[in-house]
Amino acid sequence: MRIKWKNGLSIEYKGNRVVFDAQSRILNCKVSFVTHAHTDHSYSFRLNHIPVISSEETMRLISIEGAKTRKWQPLTVNEKVKIGDLEVIPHPSGHILGSYEFEVCTPHGVVLFTGDLNTREGRIVKPAEPIRCDVLIIEATYGSPEFIFPSDREVGDEMIRWAYKVLGENKIPVFQADAIGNSQEIIRIFNENTNMPVISHWRVSKVNKVYEHYGHKIKYIDINSGEASEVISSANTVIVSPKKLDLPSNHRFVSAIVSGWALKFRGAAFPLSDHADFPSLLNFIRDCSPKIVLTYHGGAFNEILAKYIEKKMGIKSYPANLTPITFPI
């Protein structure tokens, strides 16, 4: 079995090659698997020359932006896909609606590719499942010891307190977050703990509708509705919008960033994250009991996490992009 990182994860066994979260056009490959709908993982939905496999939820979320491969195939949790002697099995990754980690089984060993990972119990998505494996390929977005998140309950309480403070100044709080994932969590925080109406940007509203289709109750008002205009005039609401979106040029709106990176920000920012923090990554690795750990998707943190794993956990580890590996070694 040969494992290689080059614009996505490639696993090859006896001439059958599959790719996970491809980031560019791929050749000589049987199938491309997509872990979830965020754009930095879902390039494969632009491809039409090979089958592209994901959850149905992922396909629906990606379709919001108009991207849809003609060769998409659905895959449900624990359903097995055979490609020669490779067997691929999806499990929940805990990140966003429909997100998967992929277990790849061969006669010579088991690989687990996490995609984006969250091991905490969310308000909407089930947490990631540790799977015993020989080779673990794990994301390192927050793969450095300084990233220790407070509990989601603590963060939610802080967000509510901040929102009431802003409203008390006769201004409107705006939470800026990823349109898929964190935005729905924010809306649920206010739905479950306040009577405050929540207005969502139209891009967030499109995502909300997909979540609702799969049975997740989210109460919101679309920003383009007449009702939203009335509620904004009353100054008793919060707004949820995508990150990096310019607000109207008046002083009535006060924005806060919602992201794990908030631990590094000054000003109004809240570390609500759909990724695992550093201790959670280590716990997940321990529970998977791998012989080798490859780190990815963390930039400089790939090496920081890999060195920590080797030194503190005694497991061979290095960044996935450094060199291909053949397993068994």
Task: Report residues per predicted region.
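Gly/Ser/Thr-rich loops at beta-strand to alpha-helix junctions
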Residues: 95-97, 176-185, 297-303
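Short hydrophobic/aromatic-enriched beta-strand-loop microsegments
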Residues: 52-56, 70-76, 194-202, 313-322
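Short, surface-exposed basic-aromatic patches at helix termini and helix-loop junctions that form
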Residues: 105, 129, 188-196, 308-315
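C-terminal regulatory/interaction regions
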Residues: 7, 215, 222-329
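Short, aromatic/basic amphipathic alpha-helical patches
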Residues: 64-69, 189-190, 210-216, 303-314
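His/Asp/Glu-rich metal-coordinating catalytic cores
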Residues: 1-27, 31-33, 37-174, 181, ...
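Short internal beta-strands
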Residues: 50-60, 137, 196-207, 293-297
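Hard-cation-handling environments
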Residues: 157-234
